[in-house]
Amino acid sequence: MSIDLNWETLTTGPDGIALAEKIRDFVHAKFQTVTLPRFIKGVKVHTFDFGSIAPEVELKDICDPLPDFYEDLDDDDGGSDEDDEGSNSCQTDEENEAAKTLRERRKMDRVERTANGSSNVSNPPSYTDTRYPGLRSMQASGDNGSPFLGVSTPGIPGGTSNLSYFHSQLASGFSGTQTPLAAVAGAHLPQGWPDRPSPSLHMSALRNQSHTSLSHTASERPMTPPQIADLSQQSIREKASASTLAVSSSTTGPVTRGGATEKTIPEEQTSEGEEPTSPPRRFREPKPEDLQTVFRVRYSGNIRLSLTVDILLDYPMPSFVGIPVRLNITGLSFDGVAVLAYIRKRAHFCFLSPEDAYAAIGADEKEAGGSGGMKMGALLHEIKVESEIGQRENGKQVLKNVGKVEKFVLEQVRRIFEDEFVYPSFWTFLV
């Protein structure tokens, strides 16, 4: 079902101008934390413009929210429903600092996942059962009836049971060997996926592996309990911290976290002599009125980001002088899947990674998207940049299209978008 957006109403007027300024401030702050190459002195973002072309939005599914959206991010007892309804306050400096730390840890985790081949934008992986437990073939998606892999019955896909969605993580194994939505895909089955061994046999095998030699390389050896303990310690250290945005408040960073876990982390996975550096993750109780919508978003418009880069010249001596280069980033296009969840006065928004995007909308959409020129799920298919050095006054020469600078800026824009907006990172708004 297609959704018409009044793009002019959303992006113009006082609210639209204020939102554009917040986005400019956010991108500028991100560039200040980037390690610059030797030939660049600094980057300053000047303006951000939404443009006049609206994205195409198509509703694909209505289901239960992702488990991460239920995480209780309050440090005190203010996580009750009554406090949720009356909460208007912004984050403290300590909470913002904690959120920044979590974002950095999540970025490192995303780099490791990409290095291991679990997230490939240009060549999305085929969904076979070679990865344990992994995503299965999309051919049987209608029979399985997953809220993300298609349904065979009318009505609301995925049903109204939040608990089946939430409790599925206990039977989904450890998230290091599967995509975030793979566990969700098998949540409705009593024993998980049909070809999945029983959890008791799996845990027994893991215990036996702990007594074997660890001489294999990291890419070949199985997942042994010491490695699982390391993952659990990392998950414990990643203390949840919400980033919220009221209608009239300032924007904060997105929430970033590890894979979905149960309400507490088993104590047997931690070392006896080591205490966790932060309390275990807490989750709110799901309610029947909680709702999540899955959208396919296509965009090829004229969003514009203007910034200045100072280039250092090494003649006649190193870093002799800096020359400002004006860059205009435009022509952005992407085709991806977005998730918007509404839970107790909070709206959670994020995009899905390519492998999760294919799982969310099914095999038919995958084939249809591939024939349209852009690969669905591969966010930011194209970004164009225009660069100029010098002035056009009085017949002076102008140097255009500085290759290295353009490449660096485009890489950073793509990295910021994927790190901050792609699940498991997500944004939370107070509504």
From Swiss-Prot:
Q: Which PROSITE patterns match?
A: SMP
Residue ranges for the region (Disordered) are: 68-153, 209-289
Q: What is the name of the gene encoding this protein?
A: mdm12
Q: Where is the composition biased (Polar residues)?
A: 115-129
A Gene Ontology molecular function term of the record: lipid binding
* Top-level taxonomic group: Eukaryota
Bilayer topology: Peripheral membrane protein
The protein's name in its UniProt record? Mitochondrial distribution and morphology protein 12
Q: Return the GO cellular component terms, semicolon-separated.
A: endoplasmic reticulum membrane; ERMES complex
Q: Where is the composition biased (Basic and acidic residues)?
A: 97-113
Extent of Acidic residues compositional bias: 69-96
Give the residue spans that cross the bilayer. none
UniProt function note: Component of the ERMES/MDM complex, which serves as a molecular tether to connect the endoplasmic reticulum (ER) and mitochondria. Components of this complex are involved in the control of mitochondrial shape and protein biogenesis, and function in nonvesicular lipid trafficking between the ER and mitochondria. Mdm12 is required for the interaction of the ER-resident membrane protein mmm1 and the outer mitochondrial membrane-resident beta-barrel protein mdm10.
Annotated domain remarks:
The SMP-LTD domain is a barrel-like domain that can bind various types of glycerophospholipids in its interior and mediate their transfer between two adjacent bilayers.
Establish whether keyword Membrane is in the entry.
Answer: yes
Assigned protein family: Belongs to the MDM12 family.
What does the UniProt entry say about where the protein is found?
A: Mitochondrion outer membrane; Endoplasmic reticulum membrane
Q: What positions does the domain SMP-LTD occupy?
A: 1-431
> Which is a GO BP term held by this UniProt record?
phospholipid transport
Q: Chief subcellular site?
A: mitochondrion
Q: Which UniProt keywords apply?
A: Endoplasmic reticulum, Lipid transport, Lipid-binding, Membrane, Mitochondrion, Mitochondrion outer membrane, Transport
Low complexity compositional bias, start-end: 241-252
Q: Which organism is it from?
A: Sclerotinia sclerotiorum (strain ATCC 18683 / 1980 / Ss-1)
Q: Summarize the subunit comment.
A: Component of the ER-mitochondria encounter structure (ERMES) or MDM complex, composed of mmm1, mdm10, mdm12 and mdm34. A mmm1 homodimer associates with one molecule of mdm12 on each side in a pairwise head-to-tail manner, and the SMP-LTD domains of mmm1 and mdm12 generate a continuous hydrophobic tunnel for phospholipid trafficking.
